[in-house]
């Protein structure tokens, strides 16, 4: 592996033209997750940029990902472990008018005391302040 894998991982901007959207360096964060001499990477492909990839075979997704990892991180060799999960609608992509929807949710909460609207559809996919 040419890259040191220091840090949390990497997000890939669209202009770079990779299939991978991002990669988490799991074994850098949690060394016990990979045997000595191996690394564990969690990779994300497809998304709103390339939704057609959700229809690809597992073998094709692995091949595309490994090819990107070779170019991006200098990965050599072949995977000794792989697991592919396809989530067709995993992370919401907010539309330009999302602010209007957010305001509507705020208005509804103000007119219905005790009703709280929470979740990824409102506050994003990470941890929020709520």
Task: Describe each PLM feature range.
Residues 1-41, 48-55, 59, 71-72:
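Mid-domain catalytic core of redox enzymes
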Residues 63-68:
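Short, well-ordered amphipathic alpha-helical segments that serve as non-catalytic structural scaffolds
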Residues 119-130:
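A conserved FAD-binding loop/helix module that cradles the flavin
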Residues 29-36, 87-117, 121:
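FAD-binding beta-loop-beta segment adjacent to the flavin cofactor pocket
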Residues 23, 43, 69, 82, ...:
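Hydrophobic, well-ordered secondary-structure elements that form the walls
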Residues 5, 74-87:
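A short coil-to-beta-strand element that immediately follows conserved catalytic motifs
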């Amino acid at each position: 592996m040419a890259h040191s894998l220091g840090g949390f991982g990497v997000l890939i901007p669209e202009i770079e033209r990779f299939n991978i959207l991002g990669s988490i360096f799991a074994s850098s964060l949690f060394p016990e997750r990979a045997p000595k001499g191996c690394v564990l990477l969690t990779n994300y492909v497809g998304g709103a940029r390339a939704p057609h990839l959700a229809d690809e075979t597992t073998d094709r997704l692995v091949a595309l990902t490994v090819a990107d990892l070779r170019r991006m991180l200098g990965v050599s060799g072949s995977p000794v472990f792989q697991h592919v999960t396809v989530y067709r609608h995993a992370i919401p992509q907010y539309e330009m008018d999302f602010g209007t929807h957010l305001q509507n949710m705020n208005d509804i909460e103000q007119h219905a005391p005790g009703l709280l609207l929470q979740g990824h559809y409102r506050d994003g996919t990470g941890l929020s302040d709520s």
